[in-house]
Amino acid sequence: HEIRIGSRTNIQDLTMGHVAKGKFGTYIGDDVTIGHSAVIHACTLEDRSFVGMSATVMDGCVIEQGAMLGAGALLAPGKRIPAGELWAGVPARKVRDLTQEEIEFFEVSADRYADLAQEYRVTIPDDLKSE
């Protein structure tokens, strides 16, 4: 299996990504934000989804577009977070529906991190840049 990462996705420090041999790959869509120290294990994160810091997403899980898993949460194997919902806790459960403003922030977050990446790239000496 494989790990695929979409464009403008932000995977923060100490995040770990894995596949489950013979079962599931890890598929991360476009404009996804994954917080520090998250564990992304053989799951699917659809476009513009959000995983909080130190959250764990287990085998076969799906976080749909515009959905959020809160910081420190554990999403048990095979669970699906529907679009527009916030889940949190151990094990993770639905907390509430997200507001439209919160869902729109996911794209703003992706924009900010993409801009930071470009700013950082400008500061790297030319001889160290990859083509």
Give the location of each predicted region.
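Glycine-rich hexapeptide-repeat left-handed beta-helix
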Residues: 13-20, 24-28, 36-131
